[in-house]
Amino acid sequence: MKKKQLKPEPYMMNRELSWLKFNERVLNEAGNPRVPLAERLTFASIYQSNLDEFYMVRVGTLMDQMESSEVVRENKTNMTSKEQVKAIIDATRELDIKKAVIYEQLMGELEPQGIRIINFNKLSGKEGELLETYFDNEIAPYLSANIISKQQPFPFLQNKEIYAVALLATKGGKTKTAIIPCSNNVFKRLIDIPTRPGTFMLSEELILHFLPKLFKKYEIKEKSLLRITRNADIDTETIYDEDMDYRDAMENLVKQRKRMNPVRMEFSRKINKKLIAEICKYIHMDKNHVFMSRVPLDLSFVFAIQNYLRMQGAEKEKLFYQKRSPRMTPQLKEKESLIAQIEQKDVLLSYPFENIKSFTNLLYEAARDDSVVSIKMTLYRLAVRSQIVDALVEAAENGKEVVVLVELRARFDEESNIEYSRKLEEAGCRVIYGLSGLKVHSKLCLITRKTEKGLEYITQIGTGNYNEKTSTLYTDLSLITAKQEIGKEAAEVFACLLRGETIEETHVLLVAPKCLQNKVLDMIDDEICHAKNREEAYIGIKINSLTDKVIIEKL
């Protein structure tokens, strides 16, 4: 007997397709004439990097599910993993068309500003000679050209790196495949044309043009640039083993991610279908995941264009947003004790408008304050040179008890967090790594002081990471309070984390997985009740995404 399939709710949308709609709005900003031109370049690059990560994580997850013997269905639209992947690919192809149109618009609008990205066929004879000399001296010595054979198997293609691929023909008519890595830190990606200031050529296009110099014995029948995106959905639950060090196991798992199966392949030109099929066979990828791109395969070069524009003087400032720096909050007097001020009143910091330095200064003050006995904190994503970590290290070196939960499973920040966990441990901090089956995404800090009144708490609860860089970019709130009922409950949260447990009951804090959804539902019910009684009722929610079906239905 077949299992009855549930019909999708008409007001719900598939999570993955909803995300693609969000990323389309990012792309729309790249085409928005009301946005300064140089900033539109940023939006174009963000759109592409967002899509890369989406394929690495979300499509990677769906493809893992497709390999399972059990059919997994999405709980809102009842779509299978296979149906979702097909819908994603179809939507991506439509977005690729839109991306190409917007890219051409951007390039056209850059020309009056003195910026051009050109191909070799747009160069004069003299310019071509100059670039040939540049290629011979600055690029060719660093290239490793591979002709695929029994002696030289198909090379491993790195995630998101650009390669030149060519179909070669011998004098006898036999064909061979060649692969050349085009990404190298030794030579520049954006090559300037000396005779034309503001005119550039991408290094991979120069490599593609001069392939005949690398394969002198062959005729180049077909050539293109290619780029693959690999699955990055590592299964961290496999490393929970009493007999192995969790951090070392996580480090090994992150290394394995670099060799996971590809989920997408992009070409810069239409090429022979047999060659595409051959490459797909080599890398074990479905040909339906192959895309043809009319724009450069990696748009990160736009930041070099922005730097060039900034160097052109004040007249180009109109192409950028007016620079705004976070201010120090007027709620606190920075030259006076922050602890004493917070004891008198709560402080709500609003990023990026206010500076996270007020919080880092509080941590440094706590590290040096004799009344502070402990600092406990959860860390998810940190800045490259983290003042937060430095303050915690100083606190530990000053004899404070410092307990830090470092979430090693913060995707793409695993290696950074592994290094920070070592630094904290070496300073004398107690470092823990979270709970099996659950990521600790909370942003919670608890400062405990021993005073004449007994133990007193200062608690910080935030919506954003403890990251000095992203706090200048993302809108987040950070509450710092001396309310003891909040501090006591935060202390219980940390006690549970240290025991490897989730908190079962809370009164003032909303803590997933057991004390968040039910409290949100209660608050929604309260507003429904107010509305039914013709009283003032309002629900305002600011979140990155909403996928909880129960809450969606309640709303």
Name the predicted role of every residue range.
Residues 543:
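Short, small/polar-rich loop/turn modules that mediate ligand/substrate recognition or access, typified
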Residues 1-539, 548, 554:
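N-terminal localization/anchoring segments of enzymes in phospholipid and broader phosphate metabolism
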